[in-house]
Swiss-Prot record:
One of its GO terms (biological process) is translation. The keyword Ribosomal protein applies. Keywords: Ribonucleoprotein, Ribosomal protein. Pfam families: Ribosomal_L28. HAMAP family: Ribosomal_bL28 (MF_00373). Signal peptide: none annotated. One of its GO terms (cellular component) is ribosome. One of its GO terms (molecular function) is structural constituent of ribosome. Belongs to the bacterial ribosomal protein bL28 family. This is Large ribosomal subunit protein bL28. It comes from Chlorobaculum parvum (strain DSM 263 / NCIMB 8327). InterPro entries: Ribosomal_bL28, Ribosomal_bL28/bL31-like_sf, Ribosomal_bL28_bact-type, Ribosomal_bL28_sf. It comes from the Bacteria.
Amino acid sequence: MSKVCVLTGKKPKYGNNVSHANNHTRTRFEPNLHTKRIWIEEEKRWVKVRVSAKAMKIMSKTGTAELAKLLK
């Protein structure tokens, strides 16, 4: 399963960990993904999606109708 948010499209980013001695080591910054079951009223069924914390905030504000459009 890929680490990509269905709603926002967030993916892992790459960068450096920088120590106090200014040593740089490469690292991968993962998005904050969660698997959620969401009820789609139009289709009368549950849909399992991987969404980021930001996407969950968007869904709570706008509702799941926007998500249903993206999943089709």
